[in-house]
């Protein structure tokens, strides 16, 4: 664990140098949000990504006299080291002693009334990556529902979307709403959390159509064309920008027996299986923090390494089902290749049916073109940043 924490620390240093120095995140704009918290009991949804320079937003708030009564933690926990989907218990922050209420403890993703009774304002400062199935925004929506139910204020300290230049992929059919899909948005929605919160509030997407008293503290120096490089890896299996850019296309392997590199140094940028009959790349997933029991643990997998692609090409492809189709064919098109989780990730049942019937990636892409155009029009009133 100490070795893993050291790696995370070193990675955060490298990513910090790569971050866009011209962008100021919402959490750094204290003059704009501290007055909104004055004299109020504040809960903070954050994790290891909630940094302003080398200081965590929690510490920054406390240093400025904010009365933080509760910390809400998302998937991977407040420190960001738990496995994907792992239940994370609550407790207390070791440094500050502030209670941590886990929203990923396996029981409920709605905070208890007793917790909400000790809160006036919920603040959000967490780094999202702009994917419909990335759970940080889902946790934000759950908290917005709680705030609307209990009459609490809601503040989003905005951060750039590293995939904010792209809008692509199937729009979620709400029949398949789940813990990896809360809103009728494309796989790549191209919005920041602040913009997404405004859209959910404005479009009546919160439970029972309720609205929350919402404030968004925007970034400065950011546009949707900005190639923003994250200063801190957002979760254990997105260790670098290539993983972030490939995630929209390779995450679908989570619903198959194919390894997407969890348990290696290259998650989401390789894929393979012991029974694949194509590809010239071999790897063996091992147990490690953030991937304690990865698919195909300890087995030598044959497949493909996508890391030779340029970042430009990774971004340009948007959502690409070519890799899933390739693996499916290379394993002989087995009947049990897809689990029911695939529909939740894809957002509909149609894509699985098309793959099984032999459709190409381009034929699949054509199915969401009109929906993406309609979404782009619908989201325009909620955009805080120029699109170019």
Predicted regions and their residues:
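Conserved functional hotspot residues or short segments at active or partner-binding sites
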Residues: 267, 271-369, 373, 387
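Conserved anion/nucleotide-ligand pocket segment
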Residues: 177-248
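Glycine-rich, charge-decorated loop segments at or immediately adjacent to ligand/cofactor-binding or catalytic sites
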Residues: 80-85, 155-177
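Glycine/threonine-rich flexible loop motifs
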Residues: 128-140
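Glycine-rich, aromatic-lined ligand/substrate-binding cores of catalytic
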Residues: 220-297
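Bacterial Sec-dependent N-terminal signal peptides
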Residues: 1-23
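Glycine-rich oxoanion-binding loops at beta->alpha junctions
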Residues: 89-119
């Amino acid at each position: 664990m100490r070795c893993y924490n050291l790696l995370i620390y070193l990675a955060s240093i490298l990513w910090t140098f790569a971050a866009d120095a011209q962008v100021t995140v919402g959490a750094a704009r204290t003059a704009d949000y501290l007055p909104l918290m004055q004299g109020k009991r504040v809960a903070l949804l954050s994790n290891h990504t909630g940094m302003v320079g080398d200081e965590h937003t929690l510490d920054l708030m406390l240093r400025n006299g904010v009365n933080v009564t509760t910390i809400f933690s998302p998937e991977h926990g407040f420190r960001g080291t738990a496995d994907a989907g792992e239940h994370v218990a609550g407790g207390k922050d070791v440094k500050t002693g502030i209670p941590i209420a886990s929203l990923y403890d396996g029981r409920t993703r709605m905070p208890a009334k007793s917790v909400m009774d000790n809160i006036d304002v919920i603040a959000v400062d967490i780094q999202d990556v702009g994917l419909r199935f990335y759970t940080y925004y889902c946790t934000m929506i759950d908290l917005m529902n709680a705030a609307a139910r209990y009459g609490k204020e809601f503040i989003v300290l905005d951060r750039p979307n590293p995939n904010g230049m792209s809008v692509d992929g199937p729009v979620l059919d709400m029949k398949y709403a789940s813990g990896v899909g809360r809103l009728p948005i494309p796989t790549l929605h191209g919005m920041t959390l602040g913009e997404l919160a405004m859209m959910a509030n404005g479009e009546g997407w919160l439970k029972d159509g309720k609205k929350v008293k919402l404030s968004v503290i925007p970034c400065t120096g950011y546009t949707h064309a900005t190639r923003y490089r994250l200063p801190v890896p957002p979760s254990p299996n997105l260790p670098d920008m290539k993983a972030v850019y490939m995630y929209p296309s390779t995450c679908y392997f989570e619903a198959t027996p194919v390894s997407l590199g969890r348990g290696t140094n290259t998650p989401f940028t390789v894929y393979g299986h012991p029974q694949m009959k194509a590809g010239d790349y071999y790897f063996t997933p091992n147990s490690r923090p953030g991937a304690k029991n990865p698919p195909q643990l300890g087995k030598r997998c044959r497949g493909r390494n996508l890391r030779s692609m340029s970042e430009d090409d990774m971004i340009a492809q948007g959502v690409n089902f070519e890799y899933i189709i390739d693996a499916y064919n290379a394993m002989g098109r087995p009947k049990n290749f897809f689990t029911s989780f695939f529909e939740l990730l894809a957002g509909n049942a149609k894509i699985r049916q098309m793959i099984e019937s032999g459709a190409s990636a381009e034929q699949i892409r054509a199915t969401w073109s009109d929906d993406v155009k309609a979404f782009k029009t619908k989201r325009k009133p909620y955009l805080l940043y120029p699109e170019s």
